[in-house]
Amino acid sequence: VGDWFQTIVDVEASPEEAGALAEGVRSWLVSSGVVSAERTHCILGAELGHPSGPRAGEVVDASGWSGPWQGGLEINVGRTVFDGGQGDPTAVSCPHCSATVELMDDDFQLDRQAWEPFRDVVHGWDEGRDVVIPCPSCGRPVEPAGWRWDDDYFVFGHLGFRFWNWPPLRTGFVAGLTARLAGHRVVFLDGKL
């Protein structure tokens, strides 16, 4: 048992435009009946979220889910490190040369030495700092949001939509939400706490 989530992150939204984009998507979700306008205590880790609306069942594949499901939508606006929940990151790749840094040792434990510089990147972003480190392979500097984490374990952005305890979102719904984000590139991640 646990809490499952699916997150759609706009990785290109600037801090200046994230609020307006969030409001546009929120308005669409409310007017479509996917979520309710009223915010309640329906999400994990945040004070209030939007509970599922009367038409939420149309945007999910609930075929593998038994009994009633409920959950909420958390909209994150502002500098955020979105993550995959349980476990640790396994590897990260350079966007310039595609070299991969393995972050797990042979016993599937986090390799502290390999992780150390990336820990600073992740925590720095959360604290409002851009920790730029060189790729250990090609030496080129990499911005925090430039690193490519295996299974999108970490995603850096200023706008994200996290659906807590919903059945899998339908592809068409994700595409519809994405279309309202000014053509920006998005990353979809899911996880469990």
Identify the residue ranges that each predicted region occupies.
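Long, contiguous alpha-helical scaffold regions
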Residues: A145-L193
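Short, non-ligating residues that shape and space the ligands of small metal-coordination modules
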Residues: V101-M104, P144-A145
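N-terminal alpha-helical interaction blocks
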Residues: V1-V92
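Short linker/helix segments within small regulatory modules
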Residues: W115-I133, D150-D151
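Residues immediately within or flanking Cys/His clusters that coordinate Zn2+
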Residues: P89-A91, V132-C135
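Amphipathic alpha-helical segments
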Residues: L21-V30, C97-T100, G172-L181
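Short cysteine-rich clusters marking metal-coordination/redox-active sites
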Residues: C94-C97, C135-C138
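Glycine-rich, often proline-containing surface loops adjacent to acidic residues and nearby aromatics
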Residues: V1-F5, A91, A99, D152-R162
